[in-house]
Amino acid sequence: MNKSNFFLLLAVCVSAFSVVMQQNQYRLNFTALDKAKKQEIALEQDYAQMRLQQARLANHEAIRAAAEKQNLHPPVSGNTFMVEHQR
């Protein structure tokens, strides 16, 4: 009986150690998931902000108003010239 008690004790210790390791791994995974969710929310907010900014910059009326405010006019052929790159 002494040998069987030793093996049972060893099995219980291995099982308990396994349970502790699994719980620790679960906690680590849960904190990593929580951190990833917070990062996802922050990235979604940044993306929404950039889309709003892109829509604002692409607004033709806003571009036209900014050009008029700065007294900018479309270029005419007399004001343009070609620059060629020589190798």
From Swiss-Prot:
The chain crosses the membrane at residues 7-23. It is a single-pass type II membrane protein. The keyword Cell inner membrane applies. This is Cell division protein FtsL. Part of a complex composed of FtsB, FtsL and FtsQ. Residues 68-87 are annotated as: Disordered. It comes from Neisseria gonorrhoeae (strain ATCC 700825 / FA 1090). The lineage of its organism: Bacteria, Pseudomonadati, Pseudomonadota, Betaproteobacteria, Neisseriales. The keyword Cell cycle applies. It is found in: Cell inner membrane. It comes from the Bacteria. Disulfide bonds: none annotated. Residues 31-71 form a coiled coil.
